Amino acid sequence: MVWTKYKLMPQDIAVYLFLENASHKRENEILSDLFENHNQMIVWDYRPDYFLLKRSVMDLLNLYELDDREYHEAERILLEISQKGADSEIETDCFGAYFKLIWMQLTYSGISYRKIKLRNLLRDFNYKRRTAALMNRMNLALNALGLKMYLRGYEKCDIRDAGLDDMIMIRLETKK
């Protein structure tokens, strides 16, 4: 069973589209493809209704594109009308959000892999030590999203066994 926290939420999609700086046409293509071909990756609440998903993502994109003054004004208005719900939940699993972004980049940006040293990945999340529990959480996120890790030479590896200074490549799982 894949946990809901490893499913794409409107926030994840909006962050990807914002960082990608895609055209409106490309945004619609990505949303449409996600809904039609990767529906199982979307959180349950948005699976049956494409327009609900699209509206939620576009509302978030509109907020992300505001400047500071406009953002604070919009935030105040939203608080006044109490339009704060499940979409504003803060995700506590930083690895889930990070690997969901990588999944979207690998699926839609035309790149076939992302590479990083495990030491840098841990440093970016402010971890000083590599514990078994931490590696298991990372591994769970990778497996839930269908991401595989490789060393140089396309050699499969498990994140728990990789060395800190090994260059790790993250790729989409190939379907057979």
Q: At which residue positions do the language-model features occur?
A:
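Charge-rich, solvent-exposed alpha-helical interaction surfaces
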Residues: D12-F18, E29-N37, S56-L60, E73-E80, ...
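Short glycine-rich, basic-tinged beta-strand/loop micro-motifs
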Residues: L31, Y108-R129
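An N-terminal amphipathic alpha-helical segment
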Residues: S88-I116
